Amino acid sequence: MAIDVVEVKRRLHSLLNDANLVNEYLRQYGPTLDIKHIKAIKEARAKAVSTAEEGEGRDPVFEIKVACPVCGLDDIPCYELRAKSQQILKNKFLVPSYQGTSGYKTLDYSLIAVTVCPRCLFASPDKKDWCRQEEAKSQIPANAIMNLQEKIGERKALVKTIANVAAYFSRPRCLDTAIASYQLAISRARVEAWYELPYALYKLGAYSLRIAKIIKDSKGDNTQSLRDALGYYEEAFRTSSCPSEEIEMQVIYAICALSLKLGDQKKAHSYISVFANLHNSRAVEMKEDPKLQTTIIDKWAERAKLLWEDRDREDLFKDE
């Protein structure tokens, strides 16, 4: 007897009461009903959500409304983290983790940091990329906005199985939803990189590392995301696309760390040598301009050297 897909979907909607869960069920198990699979889907979603917000305490997040600079949709929820509500620690790839403090509960803010337009799927964790109250315009230039308008179809293809986009990206978010939000942010940042906007390649690397951490936290293989981040950071260094010296030094440090993690000690050592070259060049410049300093260069050089000294430790990147 032929499978009645419509009837299966109807019953799944009744049992799961969530169109996105129904689509996920069908993607994993096909158009057949199995109580064990339904239970597994529910448990996976509950577990993913519970890891995002833990413990008792006040809510560390407040919501503001923004408007999309690409399609004009307004009243999009943007989740902001309250000042001093979380102790923020960064791993060896400079990706933050969060611990509640001062009476606030622990929340993995990285999971909800990216704001997503439910209409055109423009996405960014930076509220300056959005239109806000008092006629505050997006910092993204008009030519990039036009390109993003033309690429709506590409972004929709990334979440084509999602029935209710607004609900899917609402709070709390499961791990798969968080990854999807960063994939959409990567789509935006690639357009910025095409127009050679400052920090675009740095953002691409940072978003890839957020995905890598989420995958790592869910016990998955994050190697490809780490490789993606390394590639973006190398291109950022090659093109000098980071005007801030602090960010540029972070990029070089991250290249060293990622190279060691991925087993390329030769590359890591070559970028550690970059720090030495930059220090020497700055020392020469300081003879002409005493206001210049090597402080930032030396700070990140020292962090890279510490990793290099521990390069043979098996547990060096156990949390990354």
Task: Label the model's feature ranges.
Residues 266-284:
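TPR/TPR-like (Sel1-like) alpha-helical repeat modules
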Residues 1-143:
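N-terminal cysteine/histidine-rich coordination modules
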Residues 143-144, 182-185, 189-192, 233, ...:
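Alpha-helical junction/boundary sensor with strong preference for TPR arrays
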Residues 3-49, 211-218, 254-271, 293-320:
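Alpha-helical linker/edge segments of TPR/alpha-solenoid repeat scaffolds
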Residues 142-218, 246-261, 298-307:
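Amphipathic alpha-helical repeat scaffolds of TPR domains
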Residues 84-88, 283-296:
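Acidic, Ser/Thr-rich low-complexity linear motifs
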